């Protein structure tokens, strides 16, 4: 089989390569055109031997009009395109043009030449803009290798937990020293109880449950001193593991209890202590003694 397909058009022989057309190409139709062949010169497309061209010039004088070939051809497979902007690193003159500095390459292709050409660039990166999938672009830009699962899905490019150590917080490293003036005891806010009618009841005061030992020591101290100074109150509170306010309130309640018992008569009046004990109390017995003392000198006179 010949390597070229010959077609006669306007006195010239047109040759096509069999790669240009598929096997199911259709026949073309030629229409005659009046005039001389010199008015419409045509250059041969493919290389034709000189003898064949000479024989064609001496054929019948019938002339044909310029025609178009109705030829079905197979489009090239899709390829990658690279739209490169003007820069000093590369130049877009042709498919095999080399740049001054050599380096990485960029794959490209076109509808005419679907081959694997490359531009020589300064660098090691591959640029794919058109006709490339998103996953392939991520793989080209990612520096770290990606793990591929059996299903074909790509794992996220985010680093796995624990890859980079978390910086320690300064609060955990430095120990904040607590001063004495910062140790201020503040009572928590007291919550009011809801009554059955929905009205908030007054807050209840939490009572202190004293132990037997604490009550014994407090009663002993109250027997000797009904009023305490602040220094003595702090000393008793430290010895009994109480605070100053608890001791102060206990002594106030104890004095009120003592006065209540005296008013009710359940307890005799305690003799006052101190200088008040030297005051004389007038009784009927002392009055009779005084009268006898006053009468005795008169008898002597």
UniProtKB/Swiss-Prot annotation:
Localization per record: Nucleus
Any Pfam family the entry gives: Homeodomain
Organism (species): Xenopus tropicalis
PANTHER family: HOMEOBOX PROTEIN HOX-D1, HOMEOBOX PROTEIN ROUGH-RELATED
Region entry Disordered, spans: 255-301
A Gene Ontology cellular-component term: nucleus
Function: Sequence-specific transcription factor which is part of a developmental regulatory system that provides cells with specific positional identities on the anterior-posterior axis. Acts on the anterior body structures. Acts downstream of meis3 to pattern the hindbrain.
Span(s) of short sequence motif Antp-type hexapeptide: 178-183
Name by which UniProt lists this protein: Homeobox protein Hox-D1
UniProt DNA-binding residue ranges: 200-259
Family statement drawn from the similarity comment of this UniProt entry: Belongs to the Antp homeobox family. Labial subfamily.
């Amino acid at each position: 089989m010949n390597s070229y397909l010959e077609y006669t058009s306007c006195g010239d022989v047109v040759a096509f390569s069999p790669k240009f057309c598929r096997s199911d190409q259709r026949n073309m139709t030629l229409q005659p055109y009046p005039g001389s062949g010199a008015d419409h010169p045509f250059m041969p497309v493919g290389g034709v031997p000189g003898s064949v061209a000479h024989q064609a010039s001496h054929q019948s004088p019938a002339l044909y009009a310029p025609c178009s070939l109705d030829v079905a051809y197979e489009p090239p497979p899709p390829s990658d395109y690279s739209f490169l902007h003007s820069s000093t690193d590369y130049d877009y003159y042709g498919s095999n043009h080399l740049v001054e500095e050599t380096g990485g390459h960029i794959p490209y292709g076109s509808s005419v030449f679907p081959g694997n050409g490359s531009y020589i660039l300064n660098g090691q990166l591959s640029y794919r803009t058109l006709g490339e999938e998103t996953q392939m672009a991520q793989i080209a830009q990612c520096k770290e290798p990606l793990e591929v699962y059996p299903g074909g899905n790509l794992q996220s490019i985010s680093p796995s937990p624990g890859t980079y150590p978390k910086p320690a917080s300064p609060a955990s490293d430095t120990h904040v020293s607590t001063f004495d003036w910062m140790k201020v005891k503040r009572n928590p806010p007291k919550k009011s109880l809801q009554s059955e009618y929905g009205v908030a009841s007054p807050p209840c005061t939490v009572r202190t449950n004293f132990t037997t030992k604490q009550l014994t020591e407090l009663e002993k101290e109250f027997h000797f001193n009904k009023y305490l100074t602040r220094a003595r109150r702090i000393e008793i509170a430290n010895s009994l593991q109480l605070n100053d306010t608890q001791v102060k309130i206990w002594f106030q309640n104890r004095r009120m209890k003592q006065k209540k018992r005296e008013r009710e008569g359940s307890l005799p009046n305690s003799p006052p202590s101190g200088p008040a004990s030297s005051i004389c109390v007038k009784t009927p017995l002392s009055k009779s003694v005084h009268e006898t003392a006053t009468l005795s000198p008169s008898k002597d006179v």
